[in-house]
Design a protein with these regions (language model features):
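Short, glycine-anchored, charge-dense loop/turn motifs used at functional sites
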Residues: 375-382, 402
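Short beta-strand/loop motifs in extracellular/secreted proteins, especially
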Residues: 368-373
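Glycine-centered tight-turn motifs at strand-turn-strand junctions
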Residues: 381-397
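Bacterial Sec-dependent N-terminal signal peptides
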Residues: 1-24
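Residue-level detector of functionally pivotal "anchor" positions at catalytic/ligand-binding pockets or at interdomain
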Residues: 336-361, 366-367
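Hydrophobic loop/turn residues within beta-sheet-rich immunoglobulin-like superfamily modules
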Residues: 138, 367, 396-398
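Surface-exposed repetitive/solenoidal architectures
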Residues: 21-345
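C-terminal tail/sorting-segment detector
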Residues: 3, 346-349, 399-417
């Protein structure tokens, strides 16, 4: 009887562990990180985060837990292999809901891709959700050394603002480091759409990363790295080479409106570049293909620390009309076909209105009164006005490339000389 009991108890410890959601639980390392080696492991981790209770952690850095500290879900994970989600519909890890609990789930742990990639990501609109991506909401958390290869992330803002990106929908007091994406990210007029994250709030940052995926938002905020950036956020040493319907690094920054009262400062966009044919003096600099290759090789793909936490393997290369960019594996590169303007099309969306640039003026003809927003090539809103029907002119803008966005869906790039 004792032997039978012994073997029964042993079986409890060696048999695979399944969650209430049906996925196999991954093992943990000595530091408590879950070791993710399959799609089932990643689903299990997602479900654990989304179902876990928030805990109060020392978010203000004073070494104590007090009422000023935020609550987050602090689970940690590492990828130990490339993951293929197979195009199955993905529910994001965490959820942003404008700070409203209990619907909000703030991922505040560490997620280290360790130089691996996730393929087959497929995120589709979900009723009531405001944030879309591999992660819906990263708050006080870190995502690093991770690539998103292919796949689609799509949102549809029926009930208000939505935030959509390949890595995260919303980033707040969190960090994205050493990441890249080639996914297609798309949304609608009310959304903020970015190649890596939809929005950045508070003291959040993205560094040493790039986007080579398409970002689509014909009449709303769109950026190659982030769709929206708050005044305390920062983007450092980041690059965009994917097609974007407006903006290049950041689609919009909310500090633009509050700057008028002097209450905020501009967000920090430092050493950021995008592949473009023309540009103006902005926070992010447009580079020709050859200059882009030189810069990204010097600043992103050169290891400053002799291998310590440096995931990139290889150098960017320009051959004919194709730009090749390295990933974490020398046998796998991202190829970007070049055209005259890879970050914006001449006419992004067609509408009932007519827009053109004449002698340094933006001339607009509309059939009815409507609002218009002018965005510079770095993605910052530089002017917002309401037009009457008929013919109108906008003057006083500096020379450069702008995206003119009308509320009827018209979105056109113009060059002021």
């Amino acid at each position: 009887m004792m032997n039978k009991l012994y073997f029964y108890c042993l079986a409890l410890f060696v048999a695979p562990t399944f969650s209430a959601f049906g996925q196999t639980q991954p093992s943990q390392d000595e530091n408590g990180y879950y070791l993710i080696e399959s799609a089932e492991h990643l689903k299990w981790f997602r479900d654990q985060v989304n179902a876990s209770e928030h805990e109060q952690v020392d978010t203000n850095g004073d070494g104590q837990i007090n009422m000023d500290d935020d609550t987050v879900v602090r689970l940690n994970a590492k990828l130990t292999a490339d993951i293929d989600l197979g195009g199955e519909s993905w529910t994001p890890i965490g959820e942003y809901n404008n700070g409203e609990e209990p619907d909000e789930v703030r991922f505040g742990g560490y997620f280290d891709g360790q130089g691996h990639v996730i393929k087959g990501l497929n995120v589709q609109p979900i009723d009531g959700r405001q944030s879309y991506g591999l992660f819906g909401y990263v708050a006080w958390g870190v995502v690093k050394n991770l690539g998103i290869v292919g796949g689609t992330v799509t949102s549809k803002a029926d009930d208000g603002q939505e935030y959509t990106g390949a890595i995260s929908g919303m980033l707040s007091y969190g960090r994205i480091e050493n990441c890249f994406s080639t996914a297609t990210v798309s949304g609608t007029a009310e959304g903020s759409i970015g190649g890596l994250t939809g929005g950045m709030r508070k003291i959040s940052s993205i560094s040493n990363s790039y986007n080579a995926g398409t970002v689509i938002n014909p009449s709303g905020m769109a950026g190659g790295i982030t769709g929206y950036i708050g005044s305390d956020a920062s983007v450092y040493n980041c690059y965009n080479m994917g097609k974007v319907t407006g903006g290049a690094i950041s689609g919009d920054d909310y500090s633009e409106s509050t700057l008028r009262s002097g209450e905020e400062e501009l967000p920090s966009i430092i050493d950021c570049y995008y592949l473009e044919g023309a540009g103006s003096g902005t926070l992010a600099k447009a580079l020709s293909a050859s200059d882009f290759v030189t810069t990204i090789n010097e600043k992103l793909f050169t290891d400053p620390n002799n291998g310590e936490d440096f995931p990139w393997d290889g150098k960017a290369n320009l051959a004919g009309d194709r730009l090749s960019v390295p990933t974490f594996d020398s046998s796998s590169v991202v190829e970007v076909p070049l055209d005259d303007d890879p970050t914006a099309t001449e006419t992004i969306a067609k509408g009932e209105s007519h827009i053109q640039a004449i002698d340094g003026r933006i001339c607009i003809t509309t059939s009815e009164p409507m609002k218009v927003r002018v965005v510079n090539i770095a993605g910052q809103t530089v002017r917002t006005v309401s037009l009457s029907d008929g013919y109108s002119e906008m003057t006083g803008l500096a020379e450069g490339v702008y995206i003119v966005v009308l509320e009827d869906g018209t979105c056109v790039k113009v060059l002021l000389r």
